[in-house]
A protein has these predicted regions:
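A conserved nucleotide-sugar
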Residues: 126
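N-terminal capping/lid subdomain adjacent to the active-site entrance of alpha/beta enzymes
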Residues: 1-101, 105-123
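A general structural motif
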Residues: 83, 132-133
Length: 133
């Protein structure tokens, strides 16, 4: 038997003993969860997410729609310089007005590239960096 089954059984026993649901035993919980806008992977179509400016335009549209945050999935194949420029352009346009997040979806090929992107995210005030390498 795995440890998770034992853990669940112990929580069940504790809930029955205290006559309370487990979520109350664990502490606070949310009744609302904030949503954020998330892009698809960029492309090279003229009307798509084909440039840093196109990503920034879309971020502005999302901000106008009331989204408090914006997550970027960038181009699968592009130079590191272009990708970091994307982070800068979006941050210049909407940074400070909404949280910015980046999910490279394991598209960075080296630890060094991931480190450079992490530093850029820090420099431009990104809220999180997800799955870089």
């Amino acid at each position: 038997m795995g440890m998770s089954q034992v853990d669940m059984a112990l929580w069940d026993i504790a809930g029955k003993y205290h006559e309370a649901p487990i979520y109350q035993l664990l502490g606070e919980y949310r009744t609302k969860l904030p949503a954020y806008a998330s892009t698809m992977v960029g492309d090279d179509q003229p009307d798509g997410l084909s440039s840093p400016e196109a990503y920034a335009d879309f971020a502005e549209q999302c901000l106008e729609l009331g989204y408090p945050a914006y997550k970027i999935h960038w181009w699968r194949e592009s130079s590191l310089k272009r990708r970091i420029k994307l982070l800068e352009v979006v941050a210049d346009r909407v940074g400070g007005k909404m949280d910015l997040m980046l999910d490279p979806a394991s598209s960075l090929l080296t630890w060094g590239d991931a480190l450079q992107v992490g530093k850029a995210c820090d420099e431009y005030g990104y809220y999180w960096l997800e799955d870089p390498y």
